[in-house]
């Protein structure tokens, strides 16, 4: 079980995402994270533990943006840790996920053969690399 929030706005969203994660924390308190988009860059802050710890890290990093996602996690794949906390991001994609990706092992092996490196023990990271791969190899990426 996990809690997920996403907000897009013309205003800064970080505080609203943290407030929402506090309300969702009963759905997972092993780890928490947030990613925002600011000036075309994905900024990510994650931590093991509760949203309170995440909030302290966010204050130190001064993360901001008008588009953002947040996640509180109850571990299903991989132990509770900062590296396994969501979101998982590449330079182009940031993903939060609740559920189990049944074919993640097969997808991971395929992506590793293409040179993608995995940092976490989660199945969610497969989505990040798969979407990134498709963005950079698809004709749709040019549109």
Annotated model-derived regions:
Residues 1-138:
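Conserved short alpha-helical segments that host acidic/polar catalytic motifs at enzyme active sites
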Residues 139-143:
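A short, hydrophobic C-terminal helix/tail in secreted or cell-surface proteins
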